[in-house]
Curated annotation (Swiss-Prot):
Gene3D superfamilies: Periplasmic binding protein-like II, Porphobilinogen deaminase, C-terminal domain. It comes from Synechococcus sp. (strain CC9902). GO terms for molecular function: hydroxymethylbilane synthase activity. One of its GO terms (biological process) is protoporphyrinogen IX biosynthetic process. Keywords: Chlorophyll biosynthesis, Porphyrin biosynthesis, Transferase. Binds 1 dipyrromethane group covalently. The porphobilinogen subunits are added to the dipyrromethane group. This is Porphobilinogen deaminase. GO terms for cellular component: cytoplasm. The keyword Electron transport does not apply. Its EC number is 2.5.1.61. CDD domains: PBP2_HuPBGD_like.
Length: 317
């Protein structure tokens, strides 16, 4: 018997709700007789705003509470920013589908006084706000003259902190700014040769309980094949490196004919060591490409860099 009701678990931040409501609307359009409800909640990552993300511990910071709802039967699916979803999921849960990716790039948002500048021309000591070790490490590598300061809170809160003068600029995800209607705040889309984006950035991941064919039948309309191939390669790369959402691992994927080309990067926190390589293969076997690239980077010393980082940012007791 087909499902008549679908329950969605979501974070309650403004961006999360925009994303979840988009999923809800798309599913309602595809399944007119389906009743869809949303349960919004705060996650650990939403509640702890006075500690850097990497110091809290990065496994499921923005997902555990949503997953718990599914595991006890109170939700059928959870909507995540795919970049926040760990590569190893709790037993009984699975990544059901991946939506079409929006712009995965990192974006520079400047304070009004700096609108005539860009990353390369910001003066010595300019304060850059970011909560991402990946962005921090890559930008330190290219722009060692800049100062970097942690910034927490939702997108609107971060923009308010920038506008108040606490920072000279922020680095944020272009996709998130666009979804919230702040695309006009983007002053520079940061090219991949400066900052490779996070695994899964720009896409949504729909997580669900395993062995639920009725649920899979409902959500399959959201699956975007090319995005899924790209993100599965990226997630395999991250999983094999045993990295999480808060480590300096960056990626980029692109198609050339029937080939998928994955570029990956691991950097030290100070930006002085940066290993970057690429791998390619048939787009029909994306995970093998990710595994191959991870092995290449490990052979070049990525494992040692990551161990140093894990030791340096080990969560505080």
């Amino acid at each position: 018997m087909a499902l008549t009701e679908l329950r969605i678990a979501s974070r309650r931040s403004q961006l999360a709700m925009v994303q979840t409501n988009w999923v809800k609307a798309e599913l309602e359009k595809a399944h007119p007789g389906l009743t869809i409800t949303v349960e919004a909640m705060a996650t650990q990552g939403d509640k702890i705003l006075d500690v850097a993300l990497a110091k809290i511990g990065d496994k499921g910071l923005f997902t555990k509470e949503l997953e718990a709802q599914m595991l006890v039967g109170r939700a059928d699916i959870a909507v995540h920013s795919l970049k926040d979803l760990p590569t190893n999921l709790p037993e009984g849960l699975m990544l059901g589908c991946i939506t079409e990716r929006e712009d995965p790039a990192d974006a520079l948002v400047l304070h009004a006084k700096n609108k005539h500048l860009n990353l390369a021309t910001l003066p010595e000591g300019a304060v850059v706000g970011t909560s991402s070790l990946r962005r921090l490490a890559q930008l330190r590598h290219h722009y060692p003259h800049l100062e970097f300061k942690d910034v927490r809170g939702n997108v609107i809160t971060r923009l308010e902190k920038l506008d108040s003068g606490a920072y000279d600029c922020l680095i944020l995800a272009a996709a998130g700014l666009g979804r919230l209607g702040f695309a006009d705040r983007i002053d520079q889309s940061i090219p991949g040769d400066i900052s490779l984006h996070a695994v899964g950035q720009g896409a949504l991941g729909i997580e669900c309980v395993e062995n639920q064919p009725d649920v899979m039948e409902i959500i399959k309309v959201l699956e975007h094949g090319p995005t899924s191939q790209r993100c599965l390669a990226e997630r395999a790369f991250l999983r094999e490196l045993e990295g999480g959402c808060q480590v300096p691992i960056g990626v980029n994927t692109r198609f050339e004919g029937d080939q998928l080309i994955l570029t990956g990067m691991v950097a030290s926190l100070d930006g002085k060591r940066l290993i970057r390589e690429q791998a390619s293969g048939p787009s029909t076997d994306p995970e093998s490409i990710g595994l191959e690239l991870a092995a290449t980077l490990k052979g070049l010393g990525a494992g040692e860099i990551l161990k140093e980082i894990f030791d340096a940012v080990r969560p505080e007791a």
